[in-house]
């Protein structure tokens, strides 16, 4: 029997989160209908509450059983789709959904990531935990305290430190990175300083075989190697021991087993040679030292490359000046940035970096906003214009009043979005995570199985071949490359996108954006400037142009429609008559009474509905619409009086940007409420493939659904509040930077500059990032799938050769360095114009 279960949700921040939860629930055969918003879900079907909660958790979110509450009438009248698109509080996280940032230590591979993530998610109050191997950080959403999170990580065998803000995080991360690189460097030098001479000496003269004559010398070398293993490789053994105590296995486990077994075998031969046949008295001290040295060297180079990958975010952090010039009654004074409060008056002069967001109250200046928006051309700002923290005054001097400070500035929001995106995982990375979770135990099993085959079926001396095979398999396997493949590409790709003024909400957005084939553009404010202008006025039935404009403007005083602003601007400062009985007729226009006349102002459908003859206007309506203008018709006392042609010009770069997207293979669609004739004229001018005209605001999401039902992968590009449901419905929502907060918070990708070139840049970076990610994953898979069988001796029957454990150690280190270096290529990526 069907029932409706009410759930309270955690961790949802946008329309796409809502869509993912809804799809996850409705994929269950025991669910008939799922109504989901950002805070709750109402699920109808035969599924149990526990099963539904588990499904939501598998989708990456939190859920608890709630008691149904009656909705207020005002809320229930709003479409659920629109509610789903609007988060509780746009600029900052809600109090119940705080984020904690942790700096981690002791992680070496993807198995460590899985272990830490499970530890964090098991803490009560945690709704979502993202662990980033590349940056050694964790971003935790929920109400859990920092102390509980740190304790959970330490209990799992790793180190953690709570970071309160980005400045402190950056300082500690740099300190840790520099200290780590120095430690890996001297550990590599010490290990290689011992390993290389021993290996060269053994190859030239002694052939690594123990005899009565050199036994004491080899014993001394063995003890020196042990010291190297303790001081230069101690972290491998400590981490492996912690993992063993926690019932897990990591890359450190493989290194510890491989080098430990090689040293123990060599020392056994050294101390009790009589137990081994003459041909089995081969020593592998140099292998232990060389492997530790090479892997430490690889870690050092990897850490250096990881630092480069974070430089885009560090550039954003550098944009904020340490002080600000505050203007008071006593004059100007320089104060620390932390002391600036909203409402304070501040001064900017040439060369200054803007400290906080605000509005100019006096003066004019040219501001360089390139680092914030990707727009290279300086912008002129004057009284009433907004300024944003991080931008630079190139010329001029202004006074401005602070409106947003600290974590509430646009720059802080950008940094927060970039960091969250860099910590996220795309769907393609989930395969690597699943493999990594079982990788080390499987490798150990392969090593033991291979060793057993060589022991029972291999040539003499079996014990030597068994040792070489087991050690080489353990050493060559590299879960580190698998673990780094996805996050390194994400960090580099998201950081590079930020440099072009493209903000990505999460890694999934990048992956989805790389598979798009259809781009849907809202017309007003997206393709066009969003500043309509009256370009022509035609009058009928003896009405004068001035009278028609005055009456039309009077009616539009009560309207918030963009076309109303154009008519009011055309009327200028003329004194307008009082309007009585004003009404907005949805989708048609407005009506009212002024100077004793009954007035109608709107589209042709309005006049037809009110039985106003428009035959005299038909030719002019067609002519204006064919030129891309929107005809606004005025009727006075039931007679056609005037046609006002309103045109919203295309953005200066729209045609070039659309041509670039068209050449990239996308199908371009325009979504507009205009009549088909006007819409087609604009589409022809812009180079649009398909037009969906006459769409009311609440029908945009349905239009997107229809395109998706045709099998298309759809992106919606918009900027207004009424675009929010469509942005949430699309596979990828792209919001223009000048748009509403609702649109920006709903979108998966936000463009900080008012240019469609940003759409092309965003999609190009998305494709490049996914391509880079696939290269990294494929490289890591190929390396392990070829390296492990070769290490197990698969080539022996054909070539009679085995892989040296030292070569295996070098290959392992090289695989991680290759992944990181390939990801760093994204930092130099430039979208083709």
Curated annotation (Swiss-Prot):
Residues reported in the UniProt entry to bind Cu(+) 1: 14, 17
Domain of life per record: Bacteria
Binding of Cu(+) 2, residues: 109, 112
Residues at which Mg(2+) binds: 719, 723
Catalytic activity: Cu(+)(in) + ATP + H2O = Cu(+)(out) + ADP + phosphate + H(+)
EC number assigned by the record: 7.2.2.8
One Gene Ontology term, aspect cellular component: membrane
Active site: 522
GO terms (BP aspect): copper ion homeostasis; viral translational frameshifting
A GO term for molecular function: ATP hydrolysis activity
Coiled-coil boundaries: none
TM stretches of this protein: 186-206, 217-237, 253-273, 283-303, 437-457, 463-483, 778-798, 800-820
Deleted gene: phenotype: Causes a mild defect in aerobic growth on CuSO(4), strongly impairs survival during anaerobic growth on CuSO(4).
Keywords attached to this entry: ATP-binding, Cell inner membrane, Cell membrane, Copper, Copper transport, Cytoplasm, Ion transport, Magnesium, Membrane, Metal-binding, Nucleotide-binding, Phosphoprotein, Repeat, Translocase, Transmembrane, Transmembrane helix, Transport
Residue span(s) of domain HMA: 3-64, 98-161
Signals that turn on the gene: Transcriptionally up-regulated by CueR in response to copper ions.
UniProt xrefs under InterPro entries: ATPase_P-typ_cyto_dom_N, ATPase_P-typ_P_site, ATPase_P-typ_TM_dom_sf, ATPase_P-typ_transduc_dom_A_sf, HAD-like_sf, HAD_sf, Heavy-metal-associated_CS, HMA_dom
Family, similarity comment: Belongs to the cation transport ATPase (P-type) (TC 3.A.3) family. Type IB subfamily.
Xref: PANTHER family: ATP7, ISOFORM B (PTHR43520), COPPER-EXPORTING P-TYPE ATPASE (PTHR43520:SF6)
Protein name: Copper-exporting P-type ATPase
């Amino acid at each position: 029997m069907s029932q409706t279960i009410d759930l309270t949700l955690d961790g949802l921040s946008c329309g796409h989160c809502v869509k993912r939860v809804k799809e996850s629930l409705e994929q269950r055969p025991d669910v008939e209908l799922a109504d989901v918003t950002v805070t709750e879900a109402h699920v109808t079907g035969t599924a149990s509450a526990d099963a539904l909660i588990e499904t939501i958790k598998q989708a990456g979110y939190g859920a608890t059983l709630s008691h149904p509450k009656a909705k207020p009438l005002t809320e229930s009248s709003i479409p659920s789709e629109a509610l789903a698109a609007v988060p509780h509080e746009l600029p900052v996280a809600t109090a119940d959904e705080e984020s904690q940032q942790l700096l981690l230590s002791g992680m070496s591979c993807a198995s460590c990531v899985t272990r830490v993530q499970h530890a964090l998610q098991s803490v009560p109050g945690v709704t979502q935990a993202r662990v980033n191997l590349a940056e050694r950080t964790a971003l935790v959403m929920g109400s859990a305290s920092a102390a509980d999170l740190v304790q959970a990580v330490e209990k799992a065998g790793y180190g953690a430190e709570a970071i309160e803000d980005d400045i402190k995080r950056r300082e500690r991360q740099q300190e840790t990175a520099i200290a780590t690189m120095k430690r890996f460097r001297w550990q590599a030098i010490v290990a290689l300083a011992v390993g290389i001479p021993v290996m060269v000496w053994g190859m030239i003269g002694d052939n690594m075989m123990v005899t009565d004559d050199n036994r004491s010398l080899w014993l001394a070398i063995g003890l020196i190697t042990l010291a190297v293993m303790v001081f230069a490789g101690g972290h491998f053994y400590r981490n492996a021991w912690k993992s063993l105590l926690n019932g897990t296995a990591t890359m450190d486990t493989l290194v510890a087993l491989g080098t430990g077994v090689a040293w123990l075998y060599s020392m056994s031969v050294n101390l009790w040679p009589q137990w081994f046949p003459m041909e089995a008295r081969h020593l592998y001290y140099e292998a232990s030292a060389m492997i530790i040295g090479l892997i430490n060297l690889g870690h050092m180079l990897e850490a250096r490359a990881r630092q480069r990958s974070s430089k885009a975010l560090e550039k954003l952090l550098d944009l904020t000046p340490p002080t600000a010039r505050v203007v008071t009654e006593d004059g100007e004074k320089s104060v620390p940035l932390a002391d600036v409060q909203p409402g304070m008056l501040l001064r900017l002069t040439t060369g200054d970096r803007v400290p906080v967001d605000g509005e100019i109250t006096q003066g004019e200046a040219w501001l360089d906003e390139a680092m914030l928006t990707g727009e290279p051309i300086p912008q002129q700002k004057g009284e009433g214009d907004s300024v944003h923290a991080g931008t630079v005054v190139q010329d001029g001097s202004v006074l401005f009043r602070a409106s947003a400070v600290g974590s509430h500035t646009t720059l802080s929001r950008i940094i927060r979005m970039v960091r969250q995106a860099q910590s996220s995982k795309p769907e393609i990375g989930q395969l690597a995570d699943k493999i990594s979770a079982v990788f080390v135990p499987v490798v150990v099993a392969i090593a033991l199985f291979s060793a057993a085959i060589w022991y029972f079926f291999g040539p003499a001396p079996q014990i030597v071949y068994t040792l070489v095979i087991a050690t080489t398999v353990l050493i060559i396997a590299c879960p580190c490359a698998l673990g780094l493949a996805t996050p390194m590409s994400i960090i580099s790709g998201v950081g590079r996108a930020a440099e072009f003024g493209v903000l990505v909400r999460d890694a999934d957005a990048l992956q989805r954006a790389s598979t798009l084939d259809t781009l849907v553009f809202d017309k007003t404010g997206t393709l066009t400037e969003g500043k309509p202008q009256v370009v022509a006025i035609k009058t009928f039935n003896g009405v004068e142009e001035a009278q028609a404009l005055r009456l039309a403007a009077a009616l539009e005083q009560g309207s918030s429609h963009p076309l109303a602003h154009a008519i009011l601007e055309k009327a200028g400062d003329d004194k307008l008559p009082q309007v009585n009985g004003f009404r907005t007729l949805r989708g048609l226009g407005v009506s009212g009474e002024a100077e004793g006349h009954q007035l109608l102002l709107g589209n042709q459908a309005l006049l037809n509905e009110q039985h106003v003859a428009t035959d005299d206007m038909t030719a002019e309506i067609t002519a204006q619409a064919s030129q891309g203008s929107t005809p606004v018709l005025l009727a006075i006392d039931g007679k056609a009086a005037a046609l006002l042609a309103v045109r919203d010009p295309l953005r200066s770069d729209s045609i070039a940007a659309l041509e670039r997207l068209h050449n990239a293979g996308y199908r371009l669609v325009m979504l507009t409420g205009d009549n088909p004739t006007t819409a087609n004229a604009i589409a022809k001018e812009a180079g649009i493939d398909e037009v969906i005209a006459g769409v009311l605001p609440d029908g945009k999401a349905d239009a997107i659904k229809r395109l998706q039902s045709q099998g298309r992968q759809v992106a919606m590009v918009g900027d207004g509040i009424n675009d929010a449901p469509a942005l949430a419905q699309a596979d990828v929502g792209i919001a223009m930077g000048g748009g509403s907060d609702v649109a920006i918070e709903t979108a998966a990708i936000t463009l900080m500059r008012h240019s469609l070139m940003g759409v092309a840049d965003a999609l190009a970076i998305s494709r490049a990032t996914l391509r880079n990610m696939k290269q990294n994953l494929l490289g890591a898979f190929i390396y392990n799938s070829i390296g492990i069988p070769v290490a197990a001796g698969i080539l022996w029957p054909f070539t009679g050769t085995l892989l040296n454990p030292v070569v295996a150690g070098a290959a392992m280190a090289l695989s991680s360095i290759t992944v990181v270096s390939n990801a760093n290529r994204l930092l130099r990526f430039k979208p083709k114009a």
